[in-house]
């Protein structure tokens, strides 16, 4: 059997009636995956949780997948051997791809210590031209160990926990992450804002969300901004939908125009 081929036979892929681009035009949301990687105690879950909250408050579809949480269900059959870690990341990469294809900004908070596994996850997105952004949540080992929120470093040092990343199992630092967050030097808010800026830079935020992120925080003002953006979205979708010759580039143009609108609104 070819490497990466399904074990099951007699299966046929069923295509959607909408392309990823058409779905994003109709919903006003472009999916993306932000892959937070780093040592235990680096701050991945903390950054991911607040980032998810900020995105949802901005009107964007977002969902966070956490390394511990998925082991209570989807990956409860996996341990922490090198092979199980590899399968853990493979499964999560596939789940993130599905979420991203549906228009959800997916935040994956996983130690994911091996570069080959992270690269394999990125490749899943590349073949479908979906947005994958690797964020290295960086902190010195001694700082992560001093934090030790789950008491795992203490167990590893005592020998009660074997194969723990950073102690007796390796962590391979990303060489080309789209963003590095030094949580020893940056505040939580600064880290989250850097992630939002990264998403905007790569077009991974819907134009309604970009407008709200930069709009005034007063409830009535936010509601008016949201209403205006939806009207603008519907108008552009109608116009661009009629221009079938330029349809393939319509989405990025829409995001760009409305991103500029959002920034200018904050200065008024």
Ranges and model annotations:
Residues 1-33:
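Extreme N-terminal, non-catalytic leader segments
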Residues 36:
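Hydrophobic anchor at the beta1->P-loop junction of P-loop NTPases
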Residues 40:
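The conserved Walker
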Residues 44:
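Conserved lysine of the Walker
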Residues 49-97, 101:
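Conserved substrate/cofactor phosphate-moiety recognition/catalytic segment
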Residues 73-80, 96-156, 163:
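ATP-dependent NMP and nucleoside kinases share a basic, alpha-helical "lid"
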Residues 138-197, 201-211:
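Small-molecule kinase domains that catalyze NTP-dependent phosphoryl transfer to phosphate-bearing small molecules
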Residues 225-229, 243, 258:
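Cysteine-centered motifs
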């Amino acid at each position: 059997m070819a490497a990466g081929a399904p074990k099951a036979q007699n299966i046929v892929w069923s295509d959607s009636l909408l392309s990823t681009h058409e779905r994003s035009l109709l919903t006003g949301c472009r999916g993306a995956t932000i892959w937070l990687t780093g040592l235990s105690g680096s701050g991945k879950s903390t950054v991911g949780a607040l980032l998810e909250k900020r995105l949802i408050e901005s009107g964007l579809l977002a969902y966070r997948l956490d390394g511990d949480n998925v082991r209570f269900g989807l990956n409860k059959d996996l341990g922490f051997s090198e092979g199980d870690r590899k399968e853990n990341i493979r499964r999560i990469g596939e789940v993130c791809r599905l979420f991203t294809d549906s228009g959800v900004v997916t935040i994956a908070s996983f130690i994911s210590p091996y570069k080959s596994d992270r690269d394999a996850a990125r490749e899943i997105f590349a073949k479908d031209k979906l947005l994958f952004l690797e964020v290295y949540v960086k902190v010195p080992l001694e700082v992560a160990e001093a934090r030790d929120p789950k008491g795992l470093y203490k167990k590893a040092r005592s020998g009660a926990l074997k194969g723990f990343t950073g102690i007796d199992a390796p962590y391979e630092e990303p060489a080309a992450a789209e963003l590095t967050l030094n949580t020893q030097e940056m505040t939580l808010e600064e880290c989250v804002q850097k992630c939002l800026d990264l998403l905007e830079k790569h077009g991974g935020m819907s134009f309604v969300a970009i407008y709200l992120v930069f709009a005034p925080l007063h409830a009535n003002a936010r509601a008016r901004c949201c209403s205006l953006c939806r009207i603008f979205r519907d108008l552009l979708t109608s116009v661009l939908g009629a221009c079938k010759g330029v349809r393939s580039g319509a989405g990025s143009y829409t995001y760009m125009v409305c991103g500029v609108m959002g920034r200018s609104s904050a200065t008024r």
